[in-house]
Amino acid sequence: MNTTNKESTEELNNTESNNNHNNFAENGNIINLKQLKRKLPEELQAQAEELKIENINSLLKQELVFAILKKSVEQGGLIVGEGVLEVLPDGFGFLRSPEVNYLAGPDDIYISPSQIRRFGLRTGDTVEGQIRAPKAGERYFALLKVNRVNFEDPSKAYHRVHFDNLTPLYPDEKLGLELENNSKDSKDFSTRVIELVAPMGKGQRALIVAPPRTGKTVLLQNIAHAITTNNPEVFLIVLLIDERPEEVTDMQRSVRGEVVSSTFDEPASRHVQLAEMVIEKAKRLVEHKKDVVILVDAITRLARAYNTVVPSSGKVLTGGVDANALQRPKRFFGAARNIENGGSLTIIGTALIETGSRMDEVIFEEFKGTGNSEIVLDRKIADKRIYPAIDITRSGTRKEDLLVDKIILNKMWVLRRIIDPMGSSEAIEFLLKKLENTKTNGEFFEMMKSPERPKNGL
């Protein structure tokens, strides 16, 4: 991408770069670019009318934001911008916005190569700072001062350890998903069932194996709600690939977290670009010892997109999958890990099966052994309108003894031994009936006798 922005002395950060943006609010009103982008188009149009901007009906949302910012600066306003850095091959970069799914637009913020070198910035860094309007002959807003990098002091970014050099460990801290059933009318037991059959930890790499119409999207929404409720310290990102637009809107309105999407009418290259931005952002946050969770719907569609854009190797597997196509989606999924001395990246992704596509079956087989937790949804259970349609006997987590107390673990094993002779439908019906009579899993276990530890595990 070409740009007419030139490096200038005002684009170089000085010793005041670490000051909070409140320190430079003296000459005018502060306009927060992030808050502006979150406004509805109707609100932006009303604001543009107040500023007497012409032809607002013909402008797209990003163009409208650009026009409002430019007019506000002319009237003496100061702008604070935030975005996720994408460094281009030429050395300079732009701050992309999650509000527009990291799509390039006129309201992106230019960062010069000297600023990138000074603070050791890389693709995926979340940068906040003061920006200025484009000068004559320039097309983009430019960053003047860096206030924060990944929500911390900029000096910390220069001394962080690269993600690939961090030591991965098994998840050893539980990611609480259980939500209390405070009323008898509450019919959602999905997160409580997951806690019983496949407990999640920070750093988990989990697959939700789902045939069509088994409730995987609703299950993801319930998991997202549980994460934001029980783990407020976790940074949640929901990544929707090749999805229907109405499902994107539903997810955005029901999830308190960052929801980014690439719908089915967009090219495969766009799916790939969005996924790369999300995983790079997550890695940068983990380097700052933060806990990040990515919910992906679906890993299968992401692998299809990579299969479309990857250069042909001449070796084609069954179903039309290129031999080299799955390396990059595996690298995406494999980034999930618990980090020694702080930080974790958890990825919970859906894998589609029984779609009638041979390619989907090949993709699932390739990903089958890569996760350390698996939740299997059953079409037969869903056809009976029993939700969550989880096949308990086929779902589970590796090294669950690191996440669960020994006494509770023993009771979970006894529960599996009771359920094992049953069919998949009878097992989930039996468990749901028991859960309906209790508010929490703790109460459920109180009903069970304290058993001895089984000699042969499950």
UniProtKB/Swiss-Prot annotation:
**What is its EC class?**
hydrolase
Q: Where is the Rho RNA-BD domain?
A: 78-153
Molecular function terms, GO-annotated: ATP binding; ATP hydrolysis activity; ATP-dependent activity, acting on RNA; helicase activity; RNA binding
Task: Name the domain of life.
Answer: Bacteria
Q: What is its EC number?
A: 3.6.4.-
Which Gene3D superfamilies does the record match to this protein? Nucleic acid-binding proteins, P-loop containing nucleotide triphosphate hydrolases
Query: What Pfam families does the annotation carry?
Result: ATP-synt_ab, Rho_N, Rho_RNA_bind
Q: Where is this region: Disordered?
A: 1-26
Q: Which NCBIfam families does the protein's record reference?
A: PRK09376.1, rho
**Quaternary structure (record):** Homohexamer. The homohexamer assembles into an open ring structure.
Function, as annotated: Facilitates transcription termination by a mechanism that involves Rho binding to the nascent RNA, activation of Rho's RNA-dependent ATPase activity, and release of the mRNA from the DNA template.
By sequence similarity, the record places it as follows: Belongs to the Rho family.
Record protein name field: Transcription termination factor Rho
